[in-house]
Amino acid sequence: MVVIRLARGGSKKRPFYNLVATDSRNRRDGRFVERVGFYNPVGSEGSENLRIALDRVKYWVDNGAQLSPAVERLVKEHSAKVSAAA
């Protein structure tokens, strides 16, 4: 089953996450099918902390992918921000 989840990167005490579509049996930071965004929880105030390709997330969900709880929260937050800006 394909799942969209966070893959951790960055260094110690400075996390950086990629939102990836991957097989659920793969390791958290292992092989993935497609990178659909990123999340930087400790980014500076002026930088972009969250970017999600909502069209690609919709594509994967329409084809049976499931979102992890953290990714589901981030997608809701990002889509609300995008709709408010438009």
From Swiss-Prot:
This is Small ribosomal subunit protein bS16. PANTHER family: 30S RIBOSOMAL PROTEIN S16, SMALL RIBOSOMAL SUBUNIT PROTEIN BS16M. GO terms for cellular component: cytoplasm; small ribosomal subunit. Keywords: Ribonucleoprotein, Ribosomal protein. GO terms for molecular function: structural constituent of ribosome. InterPro entries: Ribosomal_bS16 (IPR000307), Ribosomal_bS16_dom_sf (IPR023803). Belongs to the bacterial ribosomal protein bS16 family. GO terms for biological process: translation. The keyword Ribosomal protein applies. Pfam families: Ribosomal_S16. The keyword Ribosomal protein applies.
